[in-house]
């Protein structure tokens, strides 16, 4: 019997009482904002479901979007209506008490390019008296405004209902008064604010500084004209009372070679505090200098209040892919505990100038191992242990900041954390709850020139520079991480479709419209296995010589997890954990494995934890709800001890962050279940749990 069959059997007989929706304004019973609030605290004051009764939770309703792709949405609930962006970027409104569909908006109605960006949430806005309401969603490079009651486009917004962002959008922005503050996925780094009624640009802050702006001297002169990256893709948080928005940014590009971007590269890999009304910079802290390892900040800053040295401090906490927590006074930017600059390995790549030091917080302690040593070799079997020992001796790990090299090294902490986009939850007592990955990866750079120094053919060279990081040197991709194989792509898409995607971008893939057309055609010819000149009739070598000086001499060899012979992470467990950290003291309260491989548990191996994507929700009922794991299970943990109090199977992996809300006095916990991560089956379902009806 399959897990989906078991799940459907568990659902059978559940009564789905129809409860009338409310048109009231938002309340504490709602989940009206991505991650629960503009503070991104992932906290709910609801208490109906608590430690004493959580074991009685049952499926209340389900809804199938009909899509089969990764479903990472943190769903909104306002006035008894649940709003979700489906895996194919549809926007759907459901009765939050029954799961009954109320309306559905399909971007195909606007001939929109859906892209493939994982859409993790929506933005709901209403004016003070609730007379004006809008629901914002990103599809491809467009920002759309919908009527929350009908799902119809609001045509007076932007140009006929949408604004061209010139960049994809995976994480929703944040509302301050009547402006929507947004980041993006690619392009030249900037955070922007738009008028919620008209779509007009209200302000812009350049994250790759221009002449006269703070940080301009941390880049080569004139870099702002061509440099890309530093975008805040993971979202923002807002101190609404003070009018301060907090932004977490990504790596400068190219991610793994910085020979053309010498310097610290502000404001990449930084927490930046801006005046929300104007975009004026208030303070910043760069968490990774001159990043060469794609260690961008993966989750939005979280706002909380702690007691520090006997005083109440309004703080902001930022998690990282290294499993580190940086905590600052959110008004002044001063760290609550000292941050040390420590020497890190230097690169031996020609033309690279790695930054000599990197910042490390003295507290809290890292939430994961910071170096893979021989003591971490996998102990699942003698054969596995020997295999991992042999590899770590041949390709040693150099800690959290290995210098990219032509020699292979073990990358640990890995490319996907540490912490990831789910982020952490905080309760009013100042305790931070967060899930962490402990998965090793492999790091290696490749040359874009032949041994004699002459350039590789133009198409192959551009593939290594622009495509191999995700699709691999061998073009096989990494489907488990969402990077498809390009082998035989001509059998799945037409040449025109491939050319359109290459030029305009698609999901996480950036647009290559700035690459000269002859180069783009040579790249396509290489991907399609055609002779280099066949795409345009122009000799490839002439094109290569013309632009040789602009091509990086090295490219990233691709994202590769390190696994053992059976496909498990090639390291001693735990492979995924859930952690509680008291940010009043900076001390770890508890750590437990998150998830399990049932076949290993059946052999008597204690729960190992699994790779995890999606975050936790803390409630005033003393609970933590989290799915995220590869074992297609949602769990409730005791906030005080980390003990599992309840768990239930999901039809697909819950690689999303739950929401909790109440309708007509009944509390629900809802999760998007779409799987697709870690090589697991993909779907597109929403599952809501509640206590049995009276």
Question: Where in the sequence are the language-model features?
Answer:
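N-terminal pre-domain segments of enzymes
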Residues: 19-48, 355-389, 538-557
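Mature N-terminal segment immediately following signal peptide/propeptide cleavage
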Residues: 23-70, 74-77, 333, 579-581
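Repeat-blade elements of multi-bladed beta-propeller folds
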Residues: 31-35, 70-90, 114-142, 168-191, ...
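Detector for the c-type heme attachment site
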Residues: 36, 330, 438, 470-477, ...
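Extracytoplasmic/lumenal domain signature
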Residues: 52-66, 91-112, 129-130, 142-167, ...
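Gly/Gly-Pro-rich "capping" loops immediately C-terminal to redox-active cysteine motifs
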Residues: 157, 451-460, 472-503, 508-511
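The canonical Cys-X-X-Cys-His
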Residues: 463-473, 509, 523-527
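Axial heme c-ligation environment in periplasmic c-type cytochrome domains
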Residues: 480-489, 499-543
């Amino acid at each position: 019997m399959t897990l989906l069959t078991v799940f459907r059997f568990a659902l059978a007989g559940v009564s789905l009482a129809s409860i009338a929706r409310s048109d009231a304004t938002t309340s504490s019973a709602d989940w009206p904002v991505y991650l629960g609030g503009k503070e991104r605290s992932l906290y709910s004051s609801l208490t109906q479901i608590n430690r004493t009764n959580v074991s009685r939770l049952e499926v209340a309703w389900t809804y199938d979007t009909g899509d089969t792709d990764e479903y990472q949405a943190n769903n909104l609930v306002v006035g008894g209506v649940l709003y979700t962006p489906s895996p194919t970027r549809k926007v759907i409104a459901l009765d939050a008490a029954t799961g009954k569909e109320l309306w559905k908006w399909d971007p195909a109605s606007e001939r929109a390019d859906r892209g493939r960006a994982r859409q993790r949430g929506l933005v709901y806005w209403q004016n003070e008296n609730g007379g004006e309401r809008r629901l914002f969603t990103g599809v491809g490079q467009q920002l759309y405004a919908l009527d929350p009651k009908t799902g119809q486009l609001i045509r007076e917004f932007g140009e006929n209902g949408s604004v061209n962002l010139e960049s994809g959008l995976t994480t929703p922005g944040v509302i301050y008064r009547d402006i929507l503050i947004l980041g993006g996925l690619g392009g030249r780094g900037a955070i922007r604010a738009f008028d919620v009624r008209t779509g007009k640009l209200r302000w812009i802050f350049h994250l790759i500084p221009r002449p006269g702006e703070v940080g301009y001297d941390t880049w080569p002169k004139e870099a702002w004209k061509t440099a890309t990256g530093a975008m805040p893709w993971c979202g923002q948080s807002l101190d609404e009372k003070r009018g301060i928005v907090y932004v977490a940014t990504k790596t400068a590009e190219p991610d793994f070679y910085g020979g053309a971007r010498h310097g610290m590269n502000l404001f990449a890999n930084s927490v930046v505090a801006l005046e929300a009304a104007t975009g004026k910079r208030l303070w910043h802290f760069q968490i990774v200098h001159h990043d060469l390892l794609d260690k961008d900040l993966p989750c939005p800053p979280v706002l909380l209040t702690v007691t520090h040295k006997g005083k109440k401090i309004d703080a902001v906490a930022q998690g990282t892919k290294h499993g580190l927590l940086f905590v600052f006074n959110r008004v002044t930017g001063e760290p609550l505990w000292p941050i040390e600059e420590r020497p890190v390995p230097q690169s031996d790549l020609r033309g690279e100038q790695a930054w000599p030091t990197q910042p490390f917080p003295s507290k809290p302690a890292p939430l994961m191992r910071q170096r893979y040593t021989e003591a971490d070799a996998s102990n699942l079997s003698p054969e596995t242990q020997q295999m991992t020992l042999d590899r770590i001796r041949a390709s040693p790990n150099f800690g959290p900041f290995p210098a990219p090299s032509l020699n292979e090294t073990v990358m640990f902490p890995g490319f996907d954390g540490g912490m990831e986009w789910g982020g952490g939850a905080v309760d009013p007592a100042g305790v931070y709850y967060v899930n962490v990955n402990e998965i090793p990866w492999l790091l290696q750079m490749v040359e874009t020139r032949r041994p004699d120094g002459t350039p590789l053919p133009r198409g192959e060279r551009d593939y290594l520079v622009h495509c191999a990081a995700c699709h691999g040197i061998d073009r096989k991709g990494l489907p488990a991480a969402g990077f498809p194989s390009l082998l035989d792509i001509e059998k799945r898409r037409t040449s025109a479709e491939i050319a359109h995607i290459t030029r305009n971008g698609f999901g996480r893939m950036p647009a290559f419209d700035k690459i000269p057309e002859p180069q783009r055609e040579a790249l396509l010819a290489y991907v399609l296995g055609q002779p280099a000149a066949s795409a345009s009739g122009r000799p490839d070598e002439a094109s290569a010589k013309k632009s040789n000086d602009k091509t990086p001499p090295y490219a990233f060899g691709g994202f590769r997890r390190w696994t053992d012979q059976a496909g498990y992470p090639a390291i001693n467990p735990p492979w995924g954990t859930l952690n509680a950290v008291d940010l009043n003291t900076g001390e770890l309260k508890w750590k437990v494995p998150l998830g399990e491989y049932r076949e290993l548990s059946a052999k008597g191996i204690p729960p190992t934890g699994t790779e995890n994507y999606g975050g936790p929700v803390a409630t005033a009922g003393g609970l933590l709800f989290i799915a995220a794991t590869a074992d297609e299970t949602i769990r409730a943990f005791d906030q005080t001890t980390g003990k599992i109090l309840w768990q239930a199977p999901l039809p697909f992996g819950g690689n999303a962050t739950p929401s909790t809300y109440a309708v007509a006095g009944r509390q629900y916990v809802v999760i998007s279940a779409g799987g697709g991560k870690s090589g697991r089956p993909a779907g597109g379902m929403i599952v809501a749990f509640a206590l049995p009806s009276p």
